[in-house]
A protein has these predicted regions:
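Bacterial Sec-dependent N-terminal signal peptides
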Residues: 1-22
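Intrinsically disordered, low-complexity regions enriched for glutamine and histidine
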Residues: 7, 19-20, 267, 713, ...
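C-terminal outer-membrane/trafficking sorting elements
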Residues: 9, 674-676, 736-822
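Cysteine-dependent hydrolase recognition
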Residues: 21-721
Length: 822
């Protein structure tokens, strides 16, 4: 039997800084008082892969017990790495999420193999809901509802399938583990000493993990790596620098009045390596279902779509409406995630964004800002070395007469965690624009956090720091030039509550092409279904403003927001310092293993980080729906001063019938043939393009933190619309479809494998080669039919992971992995 032990992990110590708590040894029942010192409730976890199954074993020794100050006699239990239930009317039992990357999570089975528990007479406290960023502290907690007496034993099962999120061909399964069960009627608490469970798949998982290669998608690679190994490096078979086709399609959904600006933008993205498609209708009939159906049809026609951009306000392209979690207070909210979730609410087929504009001029302003940011970045080094953090010290949990100098929320603490990581490891200069009420004396961070020292830095104590940050300070810094602007506090449709920065302040910005990316992590500032919200105002602003902004369309939840913010910064600047720690939601996670700079991926990385913190499905789904990328999801932020390619003039060479590119560093290399209106793009260090007319070919070489290098061919249109890259309308066959493998259908119920592909050249020699993951050839299919969505079938492949590669005239066009199980 093949075994692969991935890790035996002890979860980090938690510092306990609260009185009235005690440690319980689960097996013996002995307790001891806790003082202001570090204390351990560390479970162990062993994860191993055995053929087609994953086996997870937990062992628990101690649990911490504390009083519920709102319900005398009730208790909270705490185990490091597990969080308290936060669903109202439920008992506050402990749970965590285990995440696993799988080829097909829909077909897996989960079985409990072993478990042991000890029962105690401990009354569990009612669950407390998460706080929003628009409410004070105690009113919300006091609203925590009593436990529903009809629940019985909760949870019924201590290991549960919580569903999965799909991104491309990888499913990330979430499994909830409960070391505590509560008998509500009899007030009996089962505390488990051992939980062992198994996930059974229909393919060899070891072989599957060895075959994974997601180097074109850093977010997916980070998630897969964590889900497989929790930080253990994965050895990919393919070299990172091996040249391969860059297959990334980009779909833009809009209406005709924005077409001029959209076409120019689509042409630019084509140069940057995206096969762009425009989906336009005179009217979307105010129907999100109509929009989604059209996107679904486009995705079936172009299955390599990875980015979705909506251009237009909700009056142009509607957004999906849902009830908020507190509908009686906050009504409905809108989301565009609906359009990226084609298969289910848990799937997300593309990275998505919206440029919400209401006129052709606004569309031109915003899209041109994005093009210029990528194409001609500013040369001022100070712009890339500076950021601003805007936050509020909230200390009003007990009324003005009982302020205690401790921060009630995490606004300042989250800002300082991020600032410390960015300044100490990456050398950025981050200005603090902080505000506190004049009567407040900021001295300590919230004791809900886990840290060795709760004192604010000395430089933040009064009178060393004035705590009077305002809109004028923000305007001054942005006008001087900052790479990013971060806000953590309460928010509203008009803007930031404290330090106050609203639409009228944006009118005073004149930062020109020094355009920051804005992280507006608060409530409501991205509510684009009303008349010009803060995010729309910031993005649309001419002669400055921002180039992209993340913001929420409804009220958002405080701890989720703190985690989201740290996860987003960790996507750009990976650092262990960006692992935020709460007492009752302590993560078992690691920093991102690989940075990503694309806005849509940055948001997705933050969303995945929230999943690692064990928030309930209800809160996770809600947070994922409300936070949006206002801007281009494919745009890459310049995380440092951009530089030109070394010896770029010699990178591109042309002969009579061949163009060769050698970059010496990992790049996206794109060829646009202006004579035949064809498009090819590759990732790697070198690429070539065969043509009888090399002077008509435009070449673009791009890479993160590099200024794009463009060699224009004859008839190139570098500042307008390249008239190819289809506009999709009622004729689904409009436009050019790139050659490549489209989809592979295989089933555990059949030995037949269907391979769908696009092959548009009649006079060519083409074949499909099937290999195993180690590169050993298994089958060659010759004499391929040509056309869009052509197909061939084969049978009798052995069980396991295979790779199908389309070869045309001796050149690799594209490849796709697939699994066969019998």
């Amino acid at each position: 039997m093949k075994r692969l032990i991935l890790i035996v992990q002890s979860i980090l110590l938690v510092a306990v800084f609260a009185s009235g708590q005690e440690m319980l040894n689960i097996a013996t029942g002995k307790t001891e008082a806790l003082k202001l010192s570090k204390a351990s409730t560390i479970p162990t976890r062993e994860v191993e892969i055995v053929d087609n199954s994953i086996i997870v074993a937990y062992n628990f020794t101690n649990v911490m017990i504390s009083e519920d100050n709102l319900n005398p006699g009730s208790k909270f239990l705490k185990i490091t790495g597990f969080c308290n239930e936060n669903t109202p009317t439920h008992p506050s039992v402990l749970t965590r999420r285990d995440l696993f990357a799988l080829p097909n999570a829909n077909d897996i089975k989960i079985r409990l193999l072993e478990s042991d528990f000890v029962e105690y007479d401990i009354p569990i406290a009612p669950a407390r809901p998460l706080l929003t960023d628009s409410e004070d502290l105690f009113d919300t907690y006091a609203d925590a509802k009593p436990i529903d007496s009809g629940i019985g034993i909760y949870p019924e099962s201590i290991v549960n399938n919580e569903g999965y999120e799909s991104r491309r061909n990888v499913d990330v399964l979430s499994v909830s583990v409960f070391p505590i069960q509560y008998d509500v009627k009899n007030k009996k608490t089962r505390i488990y000493t051992k939980i062992k469970y198994e996930i059974v798949a229909d393919v060899d998982l070891r072989q599957y993990y060895e075959s994974l290669d997601s180097t074109d998608d850093p977010v997916l690679e980070n998630v897969v790596t964590k889900a497989i190994s929790w930080g253990t490096a994965i050895d990919h078979i393919d070299s990172l620098y091996l040249t391969k086709p860059n297959i990334q399609d980009y779909l833009i959904v809009t209406v005709p009045k924005y077409m001029r600006a959209v076409k120019r933008f689509a042409s630019w993205k084509q140069l940057m390596g995206f096969n762009t498609h425009i989906l336009s209708r005179d009217s979307w009939n105010n129907s999100p279902d109509t929009v989604k159906h059209a996107i679904q049809n486009a995705y079936e026609q172009y299955p390599d779509i990875k980015y979705l951009l909506i251009v237009g306000d909700v009056e142009d392209v509607p957004a999906k409406q849902y009830e908020s979690l507190q509908n009686n207070r906050h009504g409905y909210f809108v989301t565009d995630r609906f359009y990226a979730s084609l298969n289910s609410d848990n799937s997300c087929e593309f990275y998505y964004g919206r440029v919400s504009v209401s006129s052709a001029q606004e569309a031109a302003t915003v899209l041109n800002k994005i093009i210029n940011y990528e194409k001609s970045p500013v040369t001022d080094a100070s712009f890339y070395n500076n950021g601003i953090h805007c936050a509020y010290f909230q200390d009003d949990n007990s009324g003005n007469d009982r302020r205690d100098n401790y921060e009630d929320r995490w606004f300042i603490q989250t800002s300082e965690i991020i600032r410390d990581a960015i300044t100490s490891k990456f050398g950025k200069e981050v200005a603090r624009i902080y505000y506190a009420e004049p009567a407040v004396n900021p001295e300590f961070y919230s004791t809900e956090s886990v840290r060795d020292d709760y004192n604010l830095p000395t430089e933040l104590h009064r009178p060393n720091f004035s705590w009077d940050g305002d809109g004028d300070d923000i305007i001054s810094k942005i006008n001087n030039g900052v790479l990013y602007a971060f806000h953590r506090d309460h928010g509203e449709i008009a803007g930031w509550s404290q330090p106050e920065f609203k639409g009228q302040n944006i009118d005073s910005l004149n930062n020109g092409n020094k355009l920051p990316v804005v992280l507006s992590i608060n409530c409501l500032s991205g509510k684009f279904n009303v008349d010009t919200c803060f995010a729309e105002k910031f993005l649309r602003h001419n002669n400055g403003g921002c180039v992209g902004i993340f913001a929420a369309t409804c009220v958002s939840y405080s701890r989720c927001n703190d985690v989201l913010a740290c996860g987003m910064f960790d996507a750009i600047w990976p650092s262990d310092k960006l692992i935020i720690k709460f007492h009752n939601i302590t993560p078992e996670t690691i920093a991102s293993l690989k940075p990503t700079y694309r806005l849509g991926q940055i948001l997705a990385q933050g969303m995945y980080r929230m999943s690692e913190y064990n928030f309930s499905n209800e809160f996770l789904t809600y947070q994922k729906r409300i936070f949006h990328c206002h801007g281009d999801p494919s745009m890459q932020i310049y995380s440092r001063v951009p530089t030109s390619f070394r010896r770029q003039e010699s990178m591109v060479t042309k002969s009579d019938n061949l163009i060769q590119v050698n970059t010496r560093s990992l790049s996206t290399i794109t060829f646009i043939d202006n004579k035949y209106h064809t498009f090819k793009s590759y990732t790697g260090t070198e690429a070539e393009y065969s043509t009888a007319y090399p002077d008509y070919v435009t070449v673009c070489v791009a890479a993160p933190n590099k200024i794009p290098y463009i060699v224009a061919g004859k008839h190139a249109i570098l500042d307008g619309y390249i008239d190819f890259g289809p506009i999709i309308d009622d004729n689904p066959n409009n436009g050019m479809i790139a050659d490549g493998i489209v989809k592979i259908n295989s089933s555990s119920n059949s030995s037949t494998v269907e391979i769908k592909y696009n092959l548009n050249s009649l006079a060519c020699s083409a074949s499909i080669i099937i290999t195993n993951v180690f590169g050993n050839k298994e089958l060659t299919i010759n004499n391929l039919p040509t056309g869009n969505n052509a197909s061939v079938t084969t049978q009798n492949l052995p069980s396991g992971i295979h790779i199908a590669t389309l070869v045309k005239d001796g050149a690799i066009i594209g490849s796709l992995r697939f699994a066969v199980s019998k």
